[in-house]
């Protein structure tokens, strides 16, 4: 049943994805705003490591054109020293003779400062030194590198840079793990792209004061939470049934509870999370949701519980009745089978009795005095006794005369063994089959001879 073919009498609210804030494409992923990708972190930036300050208190030495501010006495001493240095340079006097001796063991930051101060004095002391600096512009950078190497922070910086270039296989593993965790978060929220586009037609049945057993319908996508759908449904109830402002607090989201299929719904749940089966593609699924005031929530749940118990009891009674019906059917089938078997046995007994009666009639005709079989000869003919040996190795004795045919002997054996009338009986004497048309005299049988009987 689709939403177009269903006639709806209740007021309906269509939350169109193009006209409401619910369908904003930018709001699809609510939990991914603060996410980040580990791959976006750039570990190859060398500028950060190069801009590390080794010693914040070390001052950069002044340039060649910087001036020193001296007092008057120091200025006169400096001029005299400059003149003496210029004279000594003309006489090829070594500049090291006028250089002040350095302290033996400068400590800490004083060491760097003293070196820098002396370098400044040497630069300003002689023009020849200035020429040397021009010829060797890298001498100052060497002095700076020597000053920087004195600080222990420089060693720590080199160790840090070496650690950044160390490759670890676990880095790739953790990157892949973070990607999988990001994917699983997205999948748990919305399992498939088709499920995000699935449409539901929700019928909100009100149990609130003023709209009891009244309903509104809202058509939404399955990805939206009930916390976003419920305000529109409550507003639709108030507008459709003209609820006064005095009762407005009853229709607030925080004052109501939702129930579906005798179960409580939480506001963060979605229609897709209910896992309602879909009969065909693009089907608009119908959902009936009951709105109950939190004030009567316990009473409603108690009513639901009693209703469930009644349904369970009715289900148990129905199952018991179904089981009894099956047992009764099985019992009837068994009785019918037994009755049929009894009828079959009774029929066989009747047939056997009928055969016996027929055999008795024939036996009466065939048997004569002493159980002997008579032929066409007179009663004065000599009677002899022969044995009929069956396949069960049991003997039946019969009295015959010399004129008794073998056909009558075979018929007598069939009657005594209660065999069917159509049974074929063969007689053998000295391993030769006897002709049923012959008689005892034809085989020269004597008293107490034995004849073998074979049943086909």
Curated annotation (Swiss-Prot):
The modification Phosphoserine is found at residues 90, 125-126. Present with 1890 molecules/cell in log phase SD medium. GO terms for cellular component: Cul8-RING ubiquitin ligase complex; cytoplasm; nucleus. Residues 1-154 are annotated as: Disordered. It comes from Saccharomyces cerevisiae (strain ATCC 204508 / S288c) (Baker's yeast). SUMO-like region repeats lie at residues 169-287, 380-456. It comes from the Eukaryota. This is Protein ESC2. The 2 SUMO-like regions, although related to ubiquitin domains lack the conserved acceptor Gly residue in position 456. Residues 1-24, 83-93 have a biased composition (Polar residues). Residues 25-43 have a biased composition (Acidic residues). The lineage of its organism: Eukaryota, Fungi, Dikarya, Ascomycota, Saccharomycotina. InterPro entries: Rad60/SUMO-like_dom, Ubiquitin-like_dom, Ubiquitin-like_domsf. GO terms for biological process: double-strand break repair via homologous recombination; heterochromatin formation; mitotic intra-S DNA damage checkpoint signaling; mitotic sister chromatid cohesion; positive regulation of protein sumoylation; silent mating-type cassette heterochromatin formation. May be a substrate targeting component of a cullin-RING-based E3 ubiquitin-protein ligase complex RTT101(MMS1-ESC2). Involved in HMR and telomere silencing via the recruitment or stabilizing of the SIR (silent information regulators) complex. Keywords: Coiled coil, Cytoplasm, Nucleus, Phosphoprotein, Repeat, Repressor, Transcription, Transcription regulation. Pfam families: Rad60-SLD. It is found in: Cytoplasm; Nucleus. Component of a cullin-RING ligase (CRL)-like complex composed of at least the cullin RTT101, a linker protein MMS1, and the potential substrate receptor ESC2. Interacts with RTT101 and MMS1. Interacts with SIR2. GO terms for molecular function: flap-structured DNA binding; four-way junction DNA binding; SUMO ligase regulator activity; Y-form DNA binding. Residues 301-360 form a coiled coil.
């Amino acid at each position: 049943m689709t939403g177009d073919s269903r006639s709806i009498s209740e007021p309906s609210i269509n939350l169109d994805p193009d006209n409401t804030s619910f369908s904003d494409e930018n709001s699809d992923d609510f939990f991914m705003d603060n996410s980040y990708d580990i791959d976006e972190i750039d570990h190859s930036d060398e500028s950060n490591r190069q801009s590390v300050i080794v010693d914040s208190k070390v001052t950069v030495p002044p340039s060649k054109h910087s001036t020193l501010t001296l007092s008057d006495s120091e200025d006169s001493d400096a001029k005299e020293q400059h003149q003496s240095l210029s004279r000594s340079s003309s006489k090829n006097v070594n500049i090291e003779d006028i250089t002040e001796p350095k302290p033996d063991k400068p400590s800490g930051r004083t060491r760097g400062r003293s070196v820098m101060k002396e370098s400044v004095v040497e630069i300003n002391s002689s023009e020849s030194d200035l020429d040397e600096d021009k010829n060797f512009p890298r001498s100052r950078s060497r002095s700076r590198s020597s000053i920087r190497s004195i600080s222990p922070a420089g060693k720590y910086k080199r160790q840090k840079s070496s650690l950044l270039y160390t490759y670890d296989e676990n880095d790739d593993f953790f990157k892949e793990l973070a990607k999988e965790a990001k994917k699983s978060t997205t999948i748990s929220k919305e399992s498939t792209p088709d499920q995000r586009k699935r449409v539901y037609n929700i019928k909100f049945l009100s149990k609130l004061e003023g709209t009891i057993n009244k309903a509104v319908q809202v058509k939404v996508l399955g990805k939206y939470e009930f916390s976003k759908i419920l305000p529109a449904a409550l507003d639709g109830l108030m507008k459709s049934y003209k609820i006064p402002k005095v009762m407005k607090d009853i229709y607030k989201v925080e004052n109501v509870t939702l129930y579906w299929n005798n179960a409580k719904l939480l506001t963060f749940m979605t229609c897709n999370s209910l896992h309602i089966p879909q009969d065909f593609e693009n089907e608009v699924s119908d959902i009936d949701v009951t709105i109950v005031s939190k004030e009567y929530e316990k009473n409603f749940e108690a009513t639901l519980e009693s209703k469930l118990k009644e349904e369970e009891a009715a289900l148990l009674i129905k199952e018991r009745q179904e089981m009894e019906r099956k047992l009764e059917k099985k019992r009837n089938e068994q009785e019918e089978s037994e009755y049929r078997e009894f009828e079959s046995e009774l029929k066989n007994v009747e047939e056997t009795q009928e055969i016996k009666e027929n055999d008795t009639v024939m036996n009466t005709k065939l048997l004569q005095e002493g159980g002997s079989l008579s032929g066409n000869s007179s009663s004065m003919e000599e009677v002899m006794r022969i044995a009929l040996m069956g396949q069960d190795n049991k003997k039946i004795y019969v009295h015959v005369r010399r004129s008794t045919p073998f056909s009558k002997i075979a018929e007598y054996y069939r009657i005594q063994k209660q065999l069917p009338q159509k049974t074929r009986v063969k007689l053998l004497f000295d391993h030769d089959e006897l002709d049923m048309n012959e008689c005892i005299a034809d085989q020269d049988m004597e008293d107490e001879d034995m004849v073998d009987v074979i049943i086909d």
